[in-house]
């Protein structure tokens, strides 16, 4: 699975927001100040419609694309079985031959949904390593001879921040602006040699 198309789109979006979007930059003489929205202009939890149109491909980024399936699985799990374990599993090849990559890995991980109301997208899938070490492929059990570490993806998001609508510099109650920000999102885990002490 390649993440390149999604990353290229997010880089393009960042450039557009920085150079071509007057509603985020403010008026021509505001020197790049983002537009300050009132609660009436944009209700809490919503992003500007023009950003939603441009950000249609946001859903191609793995941390965004996984959210709906994770929430559906979590809903089913409440009725069918206990929640997924957070302990390092014993790897039994006969049980995981048709499982997803994160379950067949010798540094297995699970996903959780991270929610931030001041971020757009508000929900992202974060990977969490299940083992401190890695699983020995011969025994199927964890070994401390290797370490599991997270793989991080840089993702462009929009961050809501309080702003002033009257030019006083003091935040106007309920008003906010959108700022672009790159964050590091854990998308998986891999096995590495331990750092020497």
From Swiss-Prot:
Covalent S-S links between cysteines: 129-189, 134-191
According to the record, the signal peptide region is 1-18
GO BP, one annotated term: cell-cell signaling
User: Which molecular-function annotations from GO does this UniProt entry contain?
Assistant: cytokine activity
* Source organism of the structure: Homo sapiens (Human)
Q: What interactions and quaternary structure are annotated?
A: Binds to a heterodimer formed by IL17RA and IL17RE.
Gene transcribed to yield this protein: IL17C
The name this protein carries in UniProt is Interleukin-17C
Q: What is its main location?
A: secreted
**UniProt-annotated location(s):** Secreted
Q: Which family does this protein fall into? A: Belongs to the IL-17 family.
Q: Which GO terms describe its cellular component?
A: extracellular region; extracellular space
On the tree of life, the source organism's domain of life is: Eukaryota
Per UniProt, the keywords (alphabetical) are: Cytokine, Disulfide bond, Inflammatory response, Secreted, Signal
Q: InterPro entries, alphabetically? A: Cystine-knot_cytokine, IL-17_chr, IL-17_fam
Q: What does this protein do?
A: Cytokine that plays a crucial role in innate immunity of the epithelium, including to intestinal bacterial pathogens, in an autocrine manner. Stimulates the production of antibacterial peptides and pro-inflammatory molecules for host defense by signaling through the NF-kappa-B and MAPK pathways. Acts synergically with IL22 in inducing the expression of antibacterial peptides, including S100A8, S100A9, REG3A and REG3G. Synergy is also observed with TNF and IL1B in inducing DEFB2 from keratinocytes.
Induction (UniProt): Up-regulated by bacterial stimuli, including by lipopolysaccharides (LPS) in gut epithelial cell lines. This up-regulation may be mediated by Toll-like receptors TLR2 and TLR5. Up-regulated by various pro-inflammatory cytokines, including TNF, IL1B and IL17F. Up-regulation by IL17A in colon epithelial cells has been observed in some cases, but not in others.
């Amino acid at each position: 699975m390649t993440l390149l198309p999604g990353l290229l789109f997010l880089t393009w979006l960042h450039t557009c927001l920085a150079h071509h979007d007057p509603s985020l930059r403010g008026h021509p003489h505001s020197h790049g100040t983002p537009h300050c929205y009132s609660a009436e202009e944009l209700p809490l939890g919503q992003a500007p419609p023009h950003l939603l149109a441009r950000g249609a491909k946001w859903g191609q980024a793995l941390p965004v694309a996984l959210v709906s399936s994770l929430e559906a699985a979590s809903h089913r799990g409440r009725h069918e079985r206990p929640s997924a374990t957070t302990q390092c599993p014993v790897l039994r090849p006969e049980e995981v031959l048709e499982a997803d990559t994160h379950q067949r890995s010798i540094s297995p991980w699970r996903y959780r949904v991270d929610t931030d109301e001041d971020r757009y997208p508000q929900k992202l899938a974060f990977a969490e390593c299940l083992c401190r070490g890695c699983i020995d492929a011969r025994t199927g059990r964890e070994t401390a001879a290797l370490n599991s570490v997270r793989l991080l993806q840089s993702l462009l998001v929009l961050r809501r921040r309080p702003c002033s609508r009257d030019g006083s510099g003091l935040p106007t109650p309920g008003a906010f602006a959108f700022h672009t920000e790159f964050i590091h999102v854990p998308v998986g885990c891999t096995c590495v040699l331990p750092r020497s002490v």
